Amino acid sequence: MAELYERFIALYPYPHERIRHGAPRAELNRRYFEHLYEGKNRGTTPIVVALDPTLLGTIENNVSLRTSTPVQDITADTVERYAHELITDQHHYLDQVGVEVAAHEAFRHLNESAYLQTYRRLMENGELGEDDIGTPLKAEYPFELTAGIINEKVKATDIDSAAELLIMDLPLRDVSGVFAYLPFGGWDSSPSPEAMLSIARYWFERDDAYPAVIASDFIEFYTPVPVTTRRDAEILAVEHTMVSSAMPVRVYRGFDKLVEALYGQHDWYLWWEQLPRRRSSLKRPKPA
């Protein structure tokens, strides 16, 4: 893992903090918040990177494909140039169509049937469910990053194969640009970096949702203003389903459970079942 870490920070020479394996989950939550609030004054955006060979390989492949640079020749300058080009192209696209249209086009491209049959109807006609969710607003879920839960459970014998958590401060004010600097996805059914830029920008403007974690097979967002109506929870649940079709069945045991999990939730978790090199055994603990 030492070689992996050295390669990563050579590509990303930005201030960062390493979270030790087995650290209490509260430590990651606390330090992430501190980086987030400090970053607003410094013009930086923190992101928790769950570094493992698969994530780094995905990033390198995405950068290599767009820049026509062999993986072994990718440098920090290559990554920065890639990110700036992606962000510039995204800004031009948003100037033409707007943030909402760009996100909706990304949703539709990812899952056209869900977009046409469910999402558009929900946006136009109201709620899918008949009854309001009964959770009182004062019973909001506490903020807790799944990456911290996984890291807390890492045993000494598993350290060599476990992802290492880094809180990295990227030179960004536009938080959606995280997906340009760390181009997650583009394999199997996972969104491309370009799609995630559009979706993340939409979620930030509408929901004040910050990208919080990028791992090889999942991402997390943090929002200080969780959804508090059934309609908003259903809209968000359909959006999450379009981004990751495995979420309702493989993680939350049905769409209604996903709706309930997002209601009052400060942490959004999106997970993909397939990986380009291996299948992951790490999934979010299922709610009771």
Language model features by range: what are they?
Residues 194-197, 217-288:
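Alpha-helical oligomerization segments
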Residues 202-209:
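Short amphipathic beta-strand starts and helix->beta connectors
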Residues 1-176:
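Extended, low-hydrophobicity segments enriched in charged/polar residues
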